[in-house]
Amino acid sequence: LKDSIKAGKRVRTETNLGTGAVSISSAAAELALMKVESFDDCHIAILGAGKMARLLVQHLISKRANKITLLNRTIKRADELAAQFGDVEIATGTLDNMLETVVAADVVFTCTSAVEPILHRENLEPCCNGSQTLVFDIAVPRNVHSNISAIEKVFAFNVDDLKAVVAQNQESRRQMAMEAEALLDEEVEAFIDWQ
């Protein structure tokens, strides 16, 4: 048993096997953090309150996000999701307040079940105040029209951008798994020699 624990510890300390986002929601949170450097004073808006939003909130909280606003078509669903994270204060509202919330946010994540884009240049540009906004569209079909990239200081990322990050991280994990396997083989040989 002691040797098993030792082998596991070697894998954790000598490889980065558990690092790197391998889901779209974790990749979105990871990429957002790379772009803003810290979530300490970052206002984050999440549009949608389904499974993807729940996973996203988990990843954001694990990265120390503490200023989160969650909007949904129905306030009940937004409140229910926010209540699952009782140790973090999450503001809630309906999508009726979407544009005001998006403009006030530093980072926006969209993950609604809308079948048409809900954010586009025509509805967002008149509201923009000139501050930088990062928009991560993790919905399928897309919630954000590609034309919002034409708005000054609005930077949009979509599922395709995030899939590239996920694929890169999955390949990296495969490499690390091979390294971990080699370490475990060494530990098995040492154990066999000991017996």
PLM regions and their residue ranges:
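Glycine/serine-rich phosphate-binding loop and adjoining beta1-alpha1 elements at the start
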Residues: 1-39
